[in-house]
């Protein structure tokens, strides 16, 4: 088991989302890998939690990453947040799969989404959609 591709996978997903024109039209440059301070206004995309398990086989060391990408907004209703969630999904499913600096992304699957109303740190209501993905990576530099 290896976590060797953890940083490379996050960097590739971040680059794909940050460079996607359709997503940029909806959120500008608001794609983050850390929660912005306070409760930022508007809508943003956040790379979030990740769980990893061994997925090595006879041909390569590998891992299965289960990761969450969130859409957070202070806008009324879920419609705008859902449009952003669709753009995230479209960006990640567009071929080719994102290239990794180390190893290879074998597959990336959407698993589920959960939309919720929450209270921000200032007490204001925010909406959040958590998109869950499963990624299979292999470390082709290690046999």
Language-model regions, residue ranges each:
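Small/polar-rich, solvent-exposed N-terminal microdomains that initiate assembly or binding
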Residues: 1-57, 95, 99-102, 106, ...
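Short glycine/proline-enriched loop/turn "hinge" motifs that connect secondary-structure elements
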Residues: 57-62, 122-123
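Conserved acidic
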Residues: 5, 9, 80, 125
């Amino acid at each position: 088991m290896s976590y060797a591709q953890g940083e490379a996978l996050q960097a590739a997903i971040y680059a794909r989302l940050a460079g996607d024109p359709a997503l940029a039209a909806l959120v500008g440059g608001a794609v983050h890998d850390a929660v912005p301070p306070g409760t930022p206004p508007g809508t943003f995309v956040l790379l979030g939690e990740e769980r990893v398990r061994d997925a090595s086989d006879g041909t390569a060391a590998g891992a299965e990453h289960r990761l969450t990408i969130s859409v957070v907004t202070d806008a009324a209703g879920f419609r705008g947040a859902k449009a952003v969630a669709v753009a995230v999904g479209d960006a990640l499913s567009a071929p080719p799969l994102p290239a990794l600096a180390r190893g290879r992304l074998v597959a990336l699957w959407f698993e589920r989404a959960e939309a919720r109303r929450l209270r921000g740190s200032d007490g204001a209501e925010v909406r959040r959609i958590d998109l869950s993905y499963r990624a299979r990576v292999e470390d082709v530099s290690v046999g």
